[in-house]
């Protein structure tokens, strides 16, 4: 009888942890989807998210005097935040903008175009003389490939990667899709 109660208590803790970790993971992904402009999908996800939240909270609220259950709930939250951020990283939704400043005027833009990237370039004046500024928009999931390519083609280039929350027109890479 005592063993059955211990197993039930351990199972309760596991359920609290998993429900909370799942809720926070889903919450994190939903917020990213919302920020990326996918309102309808984010709204649909929120329905299931709230069910998880109410369920996990209900398991703990009735027993707030049990510090182990409260700690398990908090641990589920922390793990859920980590898992949610990893899921979001793997989904890599959206686009990134690379702004590249190079001294290799006339060399880097054609090389990037040969790799299927859309590049807009212009001449600029820097502290140390003439530079070329390149602007490249890519899918976020292809961002690491673009970074590796830039490092390979011009290790001395100054590169800034920005989140491109919206774009219209232009040429988005064909090869790296």
Swiss-Prot record:
InterPro entries hit by this protein: DUF2179 (IPR019264), DUF5698 (IPR044035), N-reg_PII/ATP_PRibTrfase_C (IPR015867), UPF0316 (IPR022930)
Membrane topology: Multi-pass membrane protein
Main location: membrane
Parts of the chain that traverse the membrane: 9-29, 41-61
Cell compartment(s), UniProt: Cell membrane
A Pfam family this chain is assigned to: DUF5698
Record's keyword terms, sorted: Cell membrane, Membrane, Transmembrane, Transmembrane helix
Source organism, top-level taxon: Bacteria
GO CC term (a single one): plasma membrane
Keyword field contains Transmembrane helix: yes
Keyword Metal-binding: no
PANTHER family: UPF0316 PROTEIN YEBE (PTHR40060:SF1)
Family to which this protein belongs: Belongs to the UPF0316 family.
NCBIfam families reported for this sequence: PRK04164.1-5
Protein name: UPF0316 protein STH2077
Organism of derivation: Symbiobacterium thermophilum (strain DSM 24528 / JCM 14929 / IAM 14863 / T)
């Amino acid at each position: 009888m005592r063993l059955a109660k211990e197993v039930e208590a351990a199972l309760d803790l596991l359920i609290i942890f998993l429900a909370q970790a799942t809720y926070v993971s889903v919450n994190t992904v939903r917020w990213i989807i919302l920020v990326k402009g996918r309102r309808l999908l984010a709204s649909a996800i929120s329905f299931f998210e709230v069910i998880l939240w109410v369920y996990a909270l209900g398991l703990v609220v009735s027993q707030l005097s049990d510090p182990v259950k409260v700690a398990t709930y908090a641990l589920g939250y922390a793990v859920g935040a980590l898992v949610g951020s990893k899921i979001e990283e793997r989904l890599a939704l959206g686009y990134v903008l690379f702004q590249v400043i190079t001294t290799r005027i006339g060399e880097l833009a054609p090389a990037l175009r040969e790799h299927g990237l859309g590049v807009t370039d212009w001449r600029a004046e820097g502290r140390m003389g003439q530079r070329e500024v390149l602007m490249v928009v890519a899918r976020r999931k292809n961002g690491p490939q673009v970074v590796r390519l830039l490092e390979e083609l011009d290790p001395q280039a100054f590169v800034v990667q920005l989140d491109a929350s919206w774009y219209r027109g232009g040429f988005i890479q064909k090869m790296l899709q």
